[in-house]
Swiss-Prot record:
This is Large ribosomal subunit protein uL10. The lineage of its organism: Bacteria, Pseudomonadati, Pseudomonadota, Alphaproteobacteria, Hyphomicrobiales. One of its GO terms (biological process) is translation. Part of the ribosomal stalk of the 50S ribosomal subunit. The N-terminus interacts with L11 and the large rRNA to form the base of the stalk. The C-terminus forms an elongated spine to which L12 dimers bind in a sequential fashion forming a multimeric L10(L12)X complex. The gene is rplJ. One of its GO terms (molecular function) is large ribosomal subunit rRNA binding. Coiled coil: none annotated. Keywords: Ribonucleoprotein, Ribosomal protein, RNA-binding, rRNA-binding. It comes from Methylorubrum populi (strain ATCC BAA-705 / NCIMB 13946 / BJ001). Forms part of the ribosomal stalk, playing a central role in the interaction of the ribosome with GTP-bound translation factors. One of its GO terms (cellular component) is large ribosomal subunit. Belongs to the universal ribosomal protein uL10 family.
Amino acid sequence: MDRTAKADLVSTLNGVFTTNAVVVVAHYKGLTVADMQKLRSQMKQAGATVKVAKNRLASIALDGTDVASIKPLLKGPTLLAYSSDPVAAAKVAVDFAKTNDKLVILGGAMGTTALNPDGVKALATLPSLDELRAKLVGLIQAPATKVAQVVNAPAAKLARVFGAYAKKDEAA
């Protein structure tokens, strides 16, 4: 890799570190190519990305970013998983690590907050942004439907009363 390619990679990684909500660092020693492809496809489905980069270049790219706290984790064969959704990358990495013991989560960062492996696992248990949005919409819509039911209930009762009077008059 020549100097310009390295500079391009550093600027790309710097952009990744500044624009994404969460970065997870893990060791991948012993993962097969098939396992890595499976991890990449699962990340892609969740809206996250996995990148393997030289630790030295990733360390340079971390300078001046909010997630610079992950620098000490960049030792050995490390991969970086990141996403704009604060939960997606952590959730996929933790789920994959449960089924494949070769992927060892070292930690990560969410904004300026450094996360240890337990912090990443705790982050993975939280609902995603889409799930939270769906719950919020449901909570907002629930009172509106209840109001509509309450408003319509007296009208329905009135209609039944008038219907009963009409039947009574017809019978008489």
